[in-house]
Amino acid sequence: MLAEVQGDPPNPDPLRRRCCGCARKPSSRKAQKKGTFWGIEVAETLQWRGWELGKEVIKHLVLKNVHEKTQKLSYRCPSTRFFITVFPQPIALSPGMSLTLPVIFRPTEKRDYEDSICFQKAEGEFSVTLRAVLPHPCLSFPAAVQLPLCAVHSATETTFTVRNVGDLTTVFAWETPSPFSMTPEHGVLSVGAECTVKVLFQPKAAAVCNVIATCWFGVEEKQKRTMQLRAQAKYPYLQVNVPGEQHKGAQPGKLQDVLCFGSVPVGTSVEKCVEILNMSAVDAPCMIERAKDPLLQDHVFSCDVSHAVVPAKGKLALCIRFQPQAVGEHSTDYFTVTPTGCLQQTVLKMVGSCKGPLVSLHQSSVDFDWINLGESSTQMLKISNVSDVPAYYQFDIDGRGSVFSLDRPCGVLEGTTTLVLKVTFRPAHPISYHRRVVCLVHHQEPLYVDFFGTCHSDTAKPAILQARHLSWYRTNTVRGLTFYPPDILSVMLKDGKLLMDEKRALMLLPEIPLDKPPKEYTEASSMSEYFYDGISSDLALFPPHVSVSPREHDFGRCVPLCKAEPLPLCVTNHTKGKITVAWTPSYGSAFQVTPESCDIPPLKSSAFRVLFQPTQLNSLYAAELEGFAFYKVLRQYSNIEEDATICPPWCLTIRLRAHTYEAKREHFIPQYLLDVPKTFPPVASDTDTYCSALLSNTGTSMITFSVNQAACPSVLVKPHSGHIMPGGHQIFFLSTRPVNTVSQQHILPLQLNSYPGYTKEIVLRSCAESLLLLLEGDGKLYFKPVCIGTSSTQRYTIKNCTRLPMAFTWKIHLSDSKLLSVRPAAGLLQPYEAMAQAWTFTPDNVTKYLLRAVVFVGWESPAPVSPQSIHYNLRIIGEGALGTIRAQKEHMDLGNVLVGNLKDCSMVLLNDGICSLQYILSVEQLITGLCDPEEVCSDPMALELEHSRGTIPARSKAFVRVTVRPARQLHYTWSISYAICTPAVPDLASTKAEQHPLCCIEATGVHPTIRIAAACSAGSASGISRLLLWRLLSLDTLNEYLQRDPAPSELTYRVPTRHSTCLIPPIYTPLQLDFNFGAAPIGSEPALVMLLLVNNGVVPVEWAFLFPSDQKMDMEHWAEDANLSPRELHQMRIQDNQLFSVSPKSGKLLPGQEEAVQLSHRHDFVGTDHLPVLLKASYGHEILLNFRGVTVEKEQRYVHFASSKHLLTPIAIGTSHPPVQIYELYNGGSTTVMFEVQLDSITRVQKDNYQHPVFICLTPRGEIAPGTTGHIEWIFSPLEARTYLVDVPIHILGGDSALITFQGEGYDPKATGESATFREVLSPSVLLGSTKLTVPGQAASLSHHRICFGNIPDRTRASRLVFLNNISEDKAVVFTWRTGSVKDNEVLQIAPEQGVVQPRGSTPCFITLQPSGRVSLYSADLVCEVYIQESLVQYERDLQEWEREKERQAVEFTITEQDLRETAHLCEPSAVVRKYKTLPPVKNHPAANQPAGHLQRRLLSSKEASHVWVKPEPPRPILLHLDVTARSHSTEDFFSNFTSEFPKYFLPRPSIHQVLFVDGSVDRNRMEKDPEWLSLATASKEELQIVTDLLIGVIRDLLENTQFHDAVRRSLQEPIPYFSQFQREETAKTQHRGQCSTIPSSLSASPDLFTEENGERKETSQESSPSNDVLGSWEGLSEVLRHEQLREQKMMMKRQPAFGSLVEMVLENTLQNILVEASCGEVVLTAQPKVIALPPRPFRSLARLRSQCQGCLCRREVAADCSLLTPKAISSLSE
């Protein structure tokens, strides 16, 4: 393991540099560090060590020139007297040469010395340090050591080197704080020696350790040096995982800690690996040990590894071995993985089961029927092993001495195989035969099969034995009837003492009082039948009918061969009938029974002898003798009267052994394999347990065996003795009955080959199991406080501490069953298995609970539940409490979320109670905004909770991750509620009454939106107005669509990407727009369009203009399609020549941010260019823009039509004054064009509408200048509420014509209830625009690009203020306003029309609109031509020089001889031959009337330039377009439709004559009816000019004619005609008021009306006499009357039109002045007004009556004392 060791800090530079620029190169020699200074290589330090006082020590300083040039330098001697060198002198070193300079050191005392030698060169100075030091100790080691990460309670180490770099031998000792230690801690280092020190880090807790270790060194004087030791300790965290298949019941995705081996064959071992995962960053030493359990358990699980180290963030494979021993046993064990320090334990559970063979016989009996004596019969017997475990089987029969024999009586049956055995029947006597043969199987219970058959002879023909007889016999045996011979049973049957049941089995007569059913035969277990035979044990299933004694006998050594004593054999008849015993002769066997047959009376015995006749010495003999006993009456079938009385014979067997080995002769050594288990299978107390053993003979000789049963009487072994043929095997079954739980050892001596020396002791252990259940926590279960109504689940573990499966059942008191439950309540625990049960506590009150539960255990399943049964008590302690949940923030606003994107936040839930709460969250969604409620109600939930249910511990909080994903551009509101999870409310399907509001979350789904805020043009498109440009680019439709929600097809590719494989990419957008760049002649400047993109949304947006090439994927050449369509070729030509360009093509806009985009179209090729460009907003709209531009030939007349269809503004039917509307034409050519409108279709429409002029063209012909826009005026007057269409041909003289469809819609305002059409002057998306959008080279800008006056009454004045800003820093600009047409000049006024704006200055311009009396829709393009003042001055200067030169050339000339000769070649034929010739003429530049471009400027050739001085061209202006829109209405229409807006406008009242002439209705009627007026309206410009000139001449003559003036004056002074008195009173009053303003009266001329002194009226003295008082009162009254008359005169003056116009002009000029002053900063319109307190008025003694007249601001003061006033005066005052 590597450690990071930091080195010593660098020593200070011994050289003292005197100047900069020295480049030092370290030398490669380690003995002496060298440096290079300006090409001189020299040692940096000379050091003296080991010097003595009184002696000189000389060292040499070598200087070497490593430069390629000769170096010159000088030096200064050391400053002290202790270092001496030669006298300084100049040094010159050739390249590669060296110089040795001796330095002598002369010490005078013992101390350290230091000095230097300074060398000087032209480049600078450098020095060499001279140092002499005393011998001193010095150790060198790293300053800091970093140790690797270490686990707590573990250790890590690293090493470092300590080196003695001093001059003395030194000792060292380390002082190291815990948890670090050093090895060795102390030592001795000689000079130059070094040693390796190991640092050991042994942390006891997790921490970052940063300590200082101190090293003391030195002999006489102790010195110290420190080292920093850094290390970090972390806690290890280990987990166990079982790779591969998941355990049943395990949760997917989690680590598995249960290792399942499944079923493993008995006697085999299986290994599986588990992973120990180290989740920490440190290596983790750990111990693997078995969990503590009783010592009696035979460990079937084992692991060879007990200690290991798991690498950091790694894993360790651990092999576990499973070797089961007992078939059918389920094994469970636990291993614990404990890190060093026992910080935490990880438990690995291992389960497995043992499987053995599963052998079965296909039939339970083999029937040989009957054969004759001397014959044999063979039948087949199938034996199968359905398990995959090999099975050892053995039929317990000796075929050599039996009438039944098998071809393979023993063998191995492989897994899942079937073996067919041949069974042969060779009878020796004419009797019936039956033998029940046991088939022993190792690791399985024995199997039984019945062999039976009958033998007939000539004289004896017994009854044929059949399978039914065996069944009846077993039933009769149970009923105790087989001890009677068949003849007696027949008699009893005849006498009625016996009956037959339904199966024809015999039965005794039933007893009358007790109605019990007869006994039936039941199959006993094979083990019980095998052991309880009355021979091997004292117990028997049924009493024997015939017994033989002994059943086994060992003759021992029989030497000599002839001295073998016969064995007396006793056969006893236990029946009540006479029986016959017939022994099967064993031919060739050494054992014989005499006599072969014999009859035995009832209840009597008979003696037989077994003779042993060996034939060979030193041999082993073993055999089994077979005999059959039967009722003698069965010898002849005729003796049998009833078939049911037939009783099968009983088989008698004797096992015999003997040997003929001599006394001193060793027996054959047996070769065998013995498979014996170590322990008996576990059982309950006083229960039999069985196991099997296998003894295999692997030798070539027979083996005899004998088990000394008397040596271990507690264990039964069967068979006790026998023999095994070579290659065969013997299966033993052992049985014992343990009575207590103390382990008991059993030793069985097994003697082989009848020799005591070949005795094998079989050692087994047995132990009875008692019920033992381990409860966790000493039988106590604690619950945390639980909210009432809710439930809490706790894990509680119970463990089976026995080797047997244990059944358990929990019982809870009925009163506690509603509060407490357990799952599972009953079950089965496998041996040593621990089960975690789920206990649920559901309190119903706020109180503390102490509950009790009982678990009953037993070996049977289910466990018996009774007080006498073994049980364990469990105490449960819990508490009920109240609890609620609240949100930390009751309202959360996530703001704007991109539609389709995710945004998450954390919702903090707080639980302030003492109990944990399990909650269920529910969400309700509310979508609001401009949407259909029924449509959005079916939307899926746009809010997703990370988890909708969970648990919050007491006094804590939980975090719930909330993710929202809005699907619409609407406002979302989610109300989150919670319900406490109770048994009544298990899931989200709870009732609303259980829901509690928690919090509210809001979010707004938004799309990334952009819009076009402004657009302007330049280059060849500079003459296009902004409104026309807006329509050409379809920006209204584009902006309107950009505000909608994107279609799903537009989101196919959310971000700009290359997705097309062809040159023309597929279209996914539902909208396609035309981007029309207009038209221009070839070679013109490119048409530039500047668009201002604004992010009007609330989220950032990324946009891009994608050309077809930007959407195509890069493909290999072989994949490209070589056949290109004309459209593809056209697009490739456009892209290759870059006819269309966009800069920049992409960008990102933050909310509210703007960016200008420049689009251009180059006019390099004649024709129409089309290019589809995709405007893509990431996660938003995708719009296809069809870029279109037209290039025409020079001098070609071309009018650009924006579209072939024009929509007129809808007009209400019945409108008396329909407005004039405009259709625009743009001249994209270089010459003036004439257009003419063909009116035939309009005439047809008028004829179809009852001669009503629906469409009226006011300008049927006209001309358009190059690069400008022409207007065609239309009047649309619908007759019905419908849509009108008319196709109008527009002819271009000398050019192409176009058919334009004009569409107008008439509507009924009463039916629709709207007058909104009047209000729609501009489309909703047309705004004022942004002033930030400028074209390249623009020096000035307007504050507004569009002005909308809205709806205004006719003949009123409306003004707007526009500022012209000079954006240049240092150049003044000159501006001039011009309008597009004569009509615009009449209705629009601009003040000032021209001027100069200083740098960074601005000029206010007032735009005034005054309709001319004809209702119209005004759309004017005001153009402000801006020039740089410097360029104009330069132009004027150049022009003056050109004019002076022109004048000079007019009077000066030069005469040459050459001119005389050239005179004859003059071009003019009529020219006179002159001797003299003038200078080259001065002439104007031939300028074509077309837009100038960089490719079209006519440059003069050098030859022409030398002869012609071209007139200077004026500078090209910068055109600033100002669009003015308005709609004028007649006064009646405006008042009826815009009543609230009417008071805002000043309506000038014309005179009577003007009213009669200018009245709109009269004028409109005359215009509509008078054909001459229509002809005048359709007149050409030249005709109108003629009429205008004639009228000007007439009016001028009238104004200059004095006689006309006198006649007019006389007509005004004529008396009033007599008939003028015949008029209405109101008219007379009106005329009187109108005359009052002009005719003076006596009252108005009276000078007494305004008699005042110092601003106050004179007051009458109160001290006058009473008569004077009355006179004064009358005078005061007259004064009041005079004031009243004066007031009436003022009111009449105010009603005059001239007065109103004057006031309006004053107010307008005042407001304009205020705005101008405010723009200059001299007036602050938003400042707070100042309040000035006026002094109080002086007190007057005379109380006055104050009254104020209506409509006047003057006041009259009348004396309060009115006692002397007459009633008439009072009444006049009241009036």
UniProtKB/Swiss-Prot annotation:
Q: What is its main location?
A: membrane
What's a single GO CC term here?
A: plasma membrane
What do mutants without this gene show? Loss of the expression of CFAP65 in testis which is associated with an inversion breakpoint into intron 3 of the gene may be responsible for the infertility associated with the Rose-comb trait.
- Where does the record place the MSP domain? 1331-1460
Membrane topology of the entry: Single-pass membrane protein; Single-pass type I membrane protein
Q: Which Pfam families match?
A: ASH, HYDIN_VesB_CFA65-like_Ig, Ig_CFAP65, Ig_CFAP65_4th, Ig_CFAP65_7th, Ig_CFAP65_8th, Ig_CFAP65__9th
GO biological process terms, semicolon-separated: flagellated sperm motility; sperm axoneme assembly
Q: Where in the cell is it found?
A: Cell projection, Cilium, Flagellum membrane; Cytoplasm; Cytoplasmic vesicle, Secretory vesicle, Acrosome membrane
Q: Where are the transmembrane segments?
A: 84-104
Per UniProt, the ranges with Polar residues bias are 1633-1645
List the Gene3D superfamilies hit by this protein, alphabetically.
Immunoglobulins
Keywords from the named record: Cell membrane, Cell projection, Cilium, Cilium biogenesis/degradation, Cytoplasm, Cytoplasmic vesicle, Flagellum, Membrane, Transmembrane, Transmembrane helix
Q: Where is this region: Disordered?
A: 1627-1672
Q: In which tissues is it expressed?
A: Expressed in testis.
Q: Which InterPro entries match?
A: ASH, CFAP65, HYDIN_VesB_CFA65-like_Ig, Ig-like_fold, Ig_CFAP65_10th
State the family it belongs to: Belongs to the CFAP65 family.
What is the recorded function of this protein according to its Swiss-Prot or TrEMBL entry?
Plays a role in flagellar formation and sperm motility.
Query: Which protein is depicted?
Result: Cilia- and flagella-associated protein 65
